[in-house]
From Swiss-Prot:
Residues 271-680 are annotated as: FAD-dependent cmnm(5)s(2)U34 oxidoreductase. In the N-terminal section; belongs to the methyltransferase superfamily. tRNA (mnm(5)s(2)U34)-methyltransferase family. The gene is mnmC. It is found in: Cytoplasm. This is tRNA 5-methylaminomethyl-2-thiouridine biosynthesis bifunctional protein MnmC.
């Protein structure tokens, strides 16, 4: 599906104050009482809230066709919240709601639709605060301190379902089959939809729907559901409800990109004290895991996560490929998460001042032209001429470009340190000054071999996440991962009267931030030195940072005030990869891949059974975040935690494949090229 702006719903309102979709000429809920209709049809029809009490797993997963006003979600959340307050010791801790919506409402329309139900306000306010841009794809919203997850998939449900990742197979406990009436919206009520409902349903998963149309009843029966007609709501004579009776076997697509969950998710070690490790820890803690973090430094954020200012904006390329799709989703998720951190009292310097990417030469101009050929929501990206950019930036900018209104800058060092403190408050055990030198697998899980103050130690954990930045290849299990260490130097520039006028982040063949009010310095950067691992100050790189700015904005007089003579800077080492995508998932077992998967193309051609690509059990990686960890780390951490806990993931199968740690080797094999066994 194209990752771009989608049409929002256009509404009218009838005499009863009920919203009507002009696209479908149908009401969003009953004129009689929408809230009671939801409780009767979708909650009672699926045996909620009573069913919460007998649910034996920690998470209950609900899927819905047609989010509409969100009334079904809010009503179920209200019931779940009451259940949790009355049953704090029950096994069920979390609610995961997945909904598909072709025409999302605007925020103001959403608020107007909810006015008649003040009892839902405590829940609807949280929805408004995170309501996403009208951007195709999945938007994950985390609410109630992690107890409630809402995955909003914007787009046509029948276009989206074939792209869903195998993490959804067999996970849905109940379906809310909503959407406009079959007579008004016949395209949605398809055989493809009913088949997918059965495929994604948990064994004995249920469904309920307001309609009793024969095409719906027969379609669900053919898909494998036992279907019953029951009394409809209000004046409606009948509705349908049922349970999955027969789950037809469906071979999972692309087993070479399988994502096995952890067989043990209660005891997890994380190696690394940067933003990737800390955000992964928080995501795991939200799910109830016991987390121990090992960091070779004396404090968090001593590596690449320790900079004063880092820019946050999406990575667009106009190609509608996995990279662009991932980074648009990652950016919007990151903004939501950072705002939640602020609301939780995590204190870190930041300004959501916008980011302006400049067309400073012919190559960058063509690149931006290609990016703007896609119709993006104005909240995400908007093209501007040089006069508009100058007004937006507060300084003369003699170039056109693209502006990201919701971008900005934040302090990675402060964010990482404050997030670490929050994780510790939530129960994470931190072992600083503990260097993990090796990993070995045994019958109890993974043994970590440590050095602490000159002494050799061992620690045992069931599951391990490697999040150690450019040190990623240091272990035997990860030494062949195709990542590269790249040094970068960021220059710290004292502000001046003119430079202090800069209102947003500038991106050119480098970047420059507005002055941080806390220290009255700008950051410009950053150099790019491959395979250099020292953290020493470089005068050459300091001058290169300044020269790039002067070259790209040669017509602007104010750039001459950029003074690097004080030699203030910070050096760090990035972990980068050729395709610029993070590595998120299971650590692949390359030796077994080379023995078990060399004939992959032949097996595909002949239809022979293909096992999942070999990987190390209960060993995971989040790395290769490069220069964009502030953007990619929050969503990457959420994906990894979801995988470890065997949850539905908030990206489609195409994007998840581009994040898989084995992707380079699998791509070679799929092209018919043999993998060479390299001698150590």
């Amino acid at each position: 599906m194209k990752n771009s702006a989608i049409c929002t719903a256009t509404l009218s309102w009838n005499d009863q104050g009920t919203p009507i979709s002009t696209q479908f000429d149908d009401v969003y809920f009953s004129n009689q009482d929408g809230l009671e209709e939801t409780r009767y049809v979708f909650l009672n029809g699926n045996c909620f809230p009573q069913r919460f009490c007998t649910h034996s797993r920690s998470s209950c997963v609900i899927a819905e066709t047609g989010f509409g006003t969100g009334l079904n979600f809010l009503t179920l959340w209200q019931a779940f919240d009451a259940f949790r307050q009355q049953n704090p010791d029950a096994p069920l801790k979390r609610l995961h709601f997945i909904s598909f919506e072709k025409y999302p409402l605007k925020t103001n329309d959403l608020k107007a639709a909810h006015q008649r139900w003040p009892e839902l306000e405590i829940f609807s306010q949280q929805l408004y605060q995170q309501w996403p841009q009208p951007l195709a794809g999945c938007h994950r919203l985390i609410m109630a301190n992690g107890a409630v997850t809402l995955d909003l998939w914007f787009g046509d449900v029948n276009d989206l379902l074939p792209t869903m990742d195998s993490s959804l197979h067999g996970k849905i406990d109940a379906w809310f089959l909503d959407g406009f009436a079959p007579a008004k919206n016949p395209q949605m009520w398809s055989e493809q939809l009913f088949t997918a409902m059965a495929q994604f349903a948990h064994p004995e998963g249920t469904f309920a729907t307001f309609t009793s149309a024969g095409i719906v009843r027969r379609g669900l029966q053919q898909a494998g559901f036992n279907v019953s007609k029951i009394k409809g709501f209000g004046r409606k004579r009948e509705m349908l409800a049922g349970v999955l009776a027969t789950q037809k076997y469906q071979p999972l697509p692309a087993p070479w990109f399988a994502r096995p969950s952890a067989s043990h998710n209660d005891d997890i070690a994380i190696i690394g004290g940067g933003i990737a490790g800390i955000l992964t820890a928080l995501a795991l803690l939200r799910r109830g895991a016991q987390v121990t973090l090992y960091c070779q430094d004396v404090a968090p954020a001593q590596g690449a996560s320790g900079n004063r200012q880092g820019a946050l904006y999406p990575l667009l390329n106009g190609s509608n490929n996995g990279l662009e799709k991932f980074f648009t989703s990652a950016f919007t998720f990151a903004r939501r998460q950072y705002e939640q951190f602020s609301a939780q009292g995590i204190d870190f310097d930041h300004q959501w001042c916008g980011v302006s990417q400049l067309a400073y030469d012919e190559k960058s101009s063509k690149k931006i032209e290609k990016m703007l050929a896609t119709e993006w929501p104005n909240e995400l990206a908007i093209g501007m001429n040089c006069h508009q950019l100058s007004e937006k930036c507060g300084l003369d900018i003699h170039h056109h470009g693209i502006h990201y209104p919701q971008g900005g800058w934040l302090c990675p060092a402060e964010l990482t340190k404050a997030a670490t403190e929050l994780a510790q408050q939530q129960g994470m055990l931190c072992c600083f000054n503990h260097q993990v030198t090796a990993l070995s697998h045994n019958q109890h899980g993974w043994q970590l071999h440590l050095m602490h103050q000159g002494q050799s130690l061992n620690a045992q954990h069931k599951t391990v996440v490697i999040a150690n930045g450019h040190h990623l290849p240091q272990f035997e299990q990860t030494e062949k991962l195709p990542v590269t260490a790249v040094r970068g130097q960021v220059s710290h520039i004292p502000t001046t009267t003119d430079l202090s006028q800069l209102q947003n982040v500038l991106c050119y063949d480098g970047y420059m931030t507005p002055a941080n009010p806390a220290n009255q310095h700008h950051c410009i950067g950053a150099s790019y030195q491959r395979h250099r691992l020292d953290n020493e100050y470089s005068e050459t790189e300091q001058q290169e940072n300044r020269d790039r700015l002067l070259k790209c904005l040669s017509d602007a007089e104010w750039v001459n005030q950029v003074d690097v003579s004080a030699k203030q800077s910070r050096q760090g080492i990035r972990c980068v990869i050729r395709d610029h995508m993070p590595m998120v998932g299971n650590v692949p077992d390359l030796n077994k891949i080379m023995t078990d998967y060399q004939d992959l193309p032949e097996k595909i051609r002949t239809g022979s059974p293909i096992t999942d690509a070999p990987c190390y059990s209960n060993l995971f990686v989040i790395g290769a975040l490069g220069s964009r960890g502030l953007c990619s780390a929050p969503l990457s951490a959420e994906i990894l935690a979801g995988q470890i806990f065997d949850e539905p993931l908030p990206l489609d199968n195409e994007i998840l494949a581009t994040l898989h740690p084995n992707r380079f080797w699998i791509k070679k094999l799929l092209k018919g090229r043999k993998l060479k066994i390299e001698k150590p």
